[in-house]
Every structure is written in structure tokens, then in C-alpha cells.
Amino acid sequence: MPTYRRPLNQQQRDILALLARFRFGTCTLFSQSLSTSLRYTHERLRILVEQEYIGKRYDNSYKLAGRSAEYYLLPKGIAMLAENDIASPKLVKLLAKDERASDRFVRHCLSILGAAAQLKSLYGKNLQFRTRSDYAGNTLFPQPLPDGYAFIESPGTEERTHYFIECFDGTMPESVMRATITKHIEFYDNDNWESDTRYPSIVLICRDERLKTKVEKWVQKAVAEGWSDNLHFELLIVTP
């Protein structure tokens, strides 16, 4: 007789939806993002792995490095999201590659999810966070697209405070990080921001205090060489 499996509950579906947007996650990051306990989050992940909705990256090297298990979508989970119009055909193709993703890509995805959780803890539950998969093809934003876009809408008004998020997590060379800072300054200086709203504040997520100090100097130098003093940069430390 086939084994009966209970349908997924909403909390398990929420984990799958997060993986569709952020690609990878850990038990701690899921717990923070969904405001659930580590114990219950771990149990939900165990069931999703057991039922082959998600895969798990973990071996002895993780334990030695004090690194948490990392989770990603498997074909069964991707298919369920596609059937419910949560994953577009283009996103489905990208998600199918995650089982073979590089360590560098995984770490960057975890940094973005960590940034989203940290920003919600700082700015409250009204903050909405979007990833590249949410705004793929958007020509209003600078290119390459920022790692994230977040906004807060004031209740009862159309006023919006918004942010571009860039994660400097040790997965890219210094030249790329500097170019990312310059990208925003040049985009703004060249009047490419075609919106009536103010250009979003740029939040640079740094992996540690040492990098944050470096980035602060790069920002000061790049702003001094640009045309406008109206851009606002904010630096935060987030460790996934």
C-alpha cells in the first residue's frame, strides 16, 4: 500500500515560497524570516526533506566549519510552486540549477536572505523586501540589478520610503564592490532615475566590521568624485 502523506501546511508552503525567492536558506534564517521557533522550523524542514520537496547541503566539512545546513528546492517543490503560479517558467529553469550551485552563489543567496531578516527587525513588519527574481527585467533600476529592493509605505498615504540593497559578503573581489558603489552614483548623476520619488537609500550589507570600515572609505571617495550629494548610503553588518 502507498504511504499516506498529509498535505503540506501553510508554514511548510511559506518555506517553499521563500526558497523560490531567495534560492537558499538555513533553519535560523527561515525562523527569523517567518517569526517561528527554531524547533518548529527544524521539524518542518525535516518533513520537507523527507518528502523530497527540498534538498539539504550538509557534510562533515560543514560541522568542522560551524556551518549550518543549507536548503534548496527539488523538482517536486518547484513543480508545486509552478502549479500554484508562485514560480514563473523562467524562474523554474533557474531553480532547477540550484542543486548544482557553487558555494559562492549559495553564500551570496544566504546573505540576501539574512539582509531581509535583519532589515525587518530594524524597520518593522511593514517593510516589504523584493529580490531580483521579483523585479527581473525592471528597466527603472540600475543595471546590473541590485541584490534587493525594500520599501515601507506609510499607512493611509501613498508615501514610500525605499531602499536598494547590495550585499558585500566576501564572495566578490574588491573591484566589484567598488564598481557597485559607483554604479548607483553614476546612475543617479546621469538622471537615469525616471521616477517622481526620491532615489532609494542604498544599504550596503557588510560581513564584518573590518569590511564595513573599508566600504565607508570607498563610499566617501566615490561620493566626493561624483556630482551629487543627495545620495544616501547606509552600512550594516549582517552575518548569515
PLM features: residue spans?
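A short beta-turn/loop motif at secondary-structure boundaries
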Residues: N60-A65, G137-F141, D196
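Active-site metal-binding core of divalent-cation-utilizing nuclease and nuclease-like domains
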Residues: S102-C109, A117-Y163, T171-A179
